[in-house]
Amino acid sequence: MGTRLPKPANGAVFKRLPEGGVLFSTEDEVYFGVGIVGARIWELLPPATSTVEEMVDILSAQYRDVSAAQIREDVDRFLKELQTNGLVSAVATDPAGT
């Protein structure tokens, strides 16, 4: 089992644009612009994928000129930014550690 992905927050609205996308927090009433890769990461959040590893595999197949390690680092950083801005929910931890 891999690292579970956070889910989009209930108050997060996403609009795809040719150059990436825009996220809107209905709670904070703030817009966030994201690039093409950020938009793709957003689109791969649950229910599209359930783990970070699954997301990295998909992105690695799309961006073959970037190492999986670099993609993982970028995904982790972007997910932290989304969480900091309240655009994704925190991942619930399983007390059994699974």
Q: How would you name each of these model-derived features?
A:
Residues M1-E29:
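Long, low-complexity, charged/polar intrinsically disordered regions in eukaryotic proteins
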Residues E27-T98:
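Long, charge-rich, low-complexity alpha-helical segments
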